[in-house]
Structure formats: C-alpha cells, structure tokens
Amino acid sequence: MGSRTDPWSARLAKAAEQRHADGGWRQRPTLSDVAPFIDFAGNDYLGLADDPRLAEAQAEAARRLGAGAKASHLVSGHLEIHERLERRLAQLTGRPRALLFSTGYMANLGVLQALCDHHTRVFQDRLNHASLIDGARLAGATSRRFHHRDLEDLERLLARAPDDAPTLVVSDGVFSMDGDVAEVGALAATARRHGAWLMIDDAHGLGVLGEVGDGCVGRAHDRREVPVLVGTLGKALGSAGAFVAGDEALIDHLIQFARPYVYTTAQPPGVAAATLTALDVLEREPERRARLHERSADFRREAGTLGLPLTDSRTPIQPIVLGDNARVMRWAERLARAGLRVGAIRAPTVPKGEARLRITLSATHDDDALDALLEGLATCQREEAA
C-alpha cells in the first residue's frame, strides 16, 4: 500500500511562492551590539527601554522574587508587585481598575473573546490593528468595518444594526501605521446614541499624549465615554505586557472569561518592577514628552523642505508613503547601509499600493541622529532621481 501524499508541503510552498511574488516576504533583522545603528523603527518613544533605572529595577526584582512568575494569575502567579502595577495603571488612566495581560495582542483578543459572541455586533475602523480584527473574528461576532476615521460611515452602519443586539465600536487610539489619532469624543458620542460601548486600543498614545502621558483617552474621557481601554507597556513605557482598564464589572468579567488571561503564566515580576519605575519616570520627567514632540516637529519641518511625501501625522509616527514595495525596500536598505534602521511596511500590513517607510521618533534622538536620518533620506531621493 503506497504512502499518502503530503498536502502540507505543497500548501506551505504555494503560500511562500505567492508571498515572494507579491514582494511581501518578511525577514527578521538580527541586530548586533557590535554594529550599532540609530533606531528609527522601534516604539521606544520616551527612550525608557535602555534606561538603566528600569534595568536595575528589573534585575533587583528578579533576584528577590524570581526570574518568572511560575504560574497564571489565577493559580499562584499573581504577586503583590502585579497588584501594585494594576493600581498604578488604573490611577494613570482614571479608571477604577486595571488588569495585566502578557501582550497587547493577547489583551485585545481577551477582551473581544470575553465580551463578544455570535449575538454581538462589532464596528471597527478599517485601519485597526490586526489583533482587534482577529479578536472579533475569533469571537464569532458579526463584524463590520467603517471607513477610516469616518464618523458618517459609522453612523450609517450603526443605524442599520438591530436595536436588540449588543454593540461594540472599536478603534485604535493612535493608528500605528499612519500616526493619526482617533476622534475619541466624537466616537463616544456616536456610540452612546446607538446604545453601544466604545473600546479604544491606546497602544501608541499611552505615555505620549495627554496632559500627564495618560494617552488620547486617559482622564480626558472617562469610563462612561470609553468603557473599555487597552494600553501597552512595551512602547512608550519601555518594558513589556499590556493592560485593560475599566470599571469593576468589566475587570471581574475578564478575570472570569478572558481565556488569554486565564490560561497564561503571569508576566515576570522583574517586568512589573521595570514598568513601575517607568511610571515613576513618566510622572517626574515630563520634559521627555516635551522633547519627543519637539523632535517630531523638527523632523516634519525638515522633511517637508525635502519634499518628502509625509502624512498628516502629528505624533512620533511619521510615515513616508512611497507606494511601491520594491521602492520601499530600496530606500530601507540604503538607509540601513548608513546605519539607520527604519520600518519597511508593505501589504498586507498596509493596503496594496501604500507601502511606506515607517519612521518613529524618540525623545533620545539628538540633533546628530536626526541630521543623519534626513541626509539618508535626501540621498535616497538623489540616487532615485539619477
């Protein structure tokens, strides 16, 4: 009797061939401390990931409490240091409670899976993060996507929805590939008119926007406007993990029903300690945020004089939309040879024809770093013209 054919090998080969043909084959850059580079690709907006105070807090907590939490939060992994961090995050965002998750992706999946099912209707901005799209899909919710930041389109879709269906409106706070900011107040008003809850993922706003770094939601929009607030700890705060903030009933519900929370080992205590230190720095050193916004404005001004195709972003995320995948890769490779790391973003992360360099600014970028980036971009322009 002959062996059965292996359908998986052919399936994987076909997918790889198609991704190569589309010009979207992804590769992981392995970075070395032997060959230093200037990072304009990461999300370390306040420069805290390399701050020695965070590293020391993490090391001290690891020595005292162990390298890992050893169990999930609901078994024996929820330590006093996690409890302290949740209280601080609730305080920062002006919510009664917060709940830690291991990653931002897991937080969004956990919320949507716990709140939604096939009876639920979810309305999402078309440019929402993949974790929000995937979460609604995995929950089995009836999902519709409205045009980017188009409140009239959202209003039209909500008006057509059955009145008896639990409804959730979902949006990024700061859109990670464009750098523009959701109109949170207007979204909240639209959701309330239709009896819907609003969920905002403020991954790129927390630590950057708001009067005290509380994000584009934070204390400016209370839990009645935004019942579900998600934030991440691995971007402006420089550590790792994520959280959901809201009222008592929401957090209790997530503890009971959010499977990515229930069935995951708690984050290492050292990570929680580093995040607590980051929150101290955020509170005591507001000049970091001021410096970040100065750097973003400096880049926009100088890039504008070069005639680079900027978007309307006023955040540290500054995309240069080049359109063509091959062109984006040429520019990124040329910049890499000059010791400059930028994001080369192609479909399916962004729509086809909108490939871009995703440039992110940090409070720690000095004048020399910014000058090197601008000179590198000018060189790309000159070489292309020639």
Swiss-Prot record:
Residue ranges that the Swiss-Prot or TrEMBL entry lists as coiled coil: none
Enzyme class: transferase
A Gene Ontology biological process term: biotin biosynthetic process
Pathway: Cofactor biosynthesis; biotin biosynthesis
UniProt entry tagged with the keyword Transferase: yes
N6-(pyridoxal phosphate)lysine modifications at: K235
Binding site for substrate: R26, H129, T349
Required co-factors: pyridoxal 5'-phosphate
A Pfam family reported for this protein in Swiss-Prot or TrEMBL: Aminotran_1_2
Gene3D superfamilies, A to Z: Aspartate Aminotransferase, domain 1, Type I PLP-dependent aspartate aminotransferase-like (Major domain)
Function (record text): Catalyzes the decarboxylative condensation of pimeloyl-[acyl-carrier protein] and L-alanine to produce 8-amino-7-oxononanoate (AON), [acyl-carrier protein], and carbon dioxide.
Subunit note: Homodimer.
Annotated protein name in UniProt: 8-amino-7-oxononanoate synthase
Originating organism: Chromohalobacter salexigens (strain ATCC BAA-138 / DSM 3043 / CIP 106854 / NCIMB 13768 / 1H11)
